[in-house]
């Protein structure tokens, strides 16, 4: 489906962006989050220059994204290691089962 114009209010300013209809709710939530971040920064930093606040917010968001990417990479690496260990355990168990079957002459069917 094609993108449609959506009007947003962020930090007292109107902004029109194109967005697919199925993503409009997520866009509105993102705009609300950004607006809240800018308001919080304004209070916390006492910076009044909107451009500076936007840059600070962008840097904070980029930092958060980098942290989340790092966590995701660490988690994926951990899961890959666990999967390899499980595969080795299963392979070892199957080899042992094969040796036991050969010794006893038992067929499992």
Swiss-Prot record:
Alphabetical UniProt keywords: Cell cycle, Cell division, Coiled coil, Cytoplasm, Septation
GO BP field: division septum assembly; FtsZ-dependent cytokinesis; septin ring assembly
Coiled coil (UniProt feature): 22-99
Highest taxon, organism lineage: Bacteria
InterPro entries for the chain: Cell_div_ZapA-like, Cell_div_ZapA-like_sf, Cell_div_ZapA_eubact, Cell_div_ZapA_N
Gene3D superfamilies linked to this entry: 1.20.5.50, Cell division protein ZapA protomer, N-terminal domain
GO cellular component entries: cell division site; cell septum; cytosol; plasma membrane
Subcellular location: Cytoplasm
Family statement: Belongs to the ZapA family. Type 1 subfamily.
Description of how the protein assembles with itself and partners: Homodimer. Interacts with FtsZ.
Biological function: Activator of cell division through the inhibition of FtsZ GTPase activity, therefore promoting FtsZ assembly into bundles of protofilaments necessary for the formation of the division Z ring. It is recruited early at mid-cell but it is not essential for cell division.
Protein name, UniProt field: Cell division protein ZapA
Organism annotation: Erwinia tasmaniensis (strain DSM 17950 / CFBP 7177 / CIP 109463 / NCPPB 4357 / Et1/99)
């Amino acid at each position: 489906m094609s993108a449609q114009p959506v009007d947003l209010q962020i930090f007292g300013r109107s902004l029109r962006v194109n967005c697919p209809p199925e993503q409009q709710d997520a866009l509105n939530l993102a705009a609300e989050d950004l607006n809240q971040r800018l308001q919080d920064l304004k209070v916390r930093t006492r910076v009044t220059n909107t451009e500076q606040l936007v840059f600070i917010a962008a840097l904070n968001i980029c930092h958060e994204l980098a942290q989340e990417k790092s966590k995701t990479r660490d988690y994926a690496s951990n899961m890959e290691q666990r999967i390899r260990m499980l595969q080795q355990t299963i392979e070892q168990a199957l080899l042992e089962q094969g040796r036991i079957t050969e010794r006893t002459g038992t067929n499992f069917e």
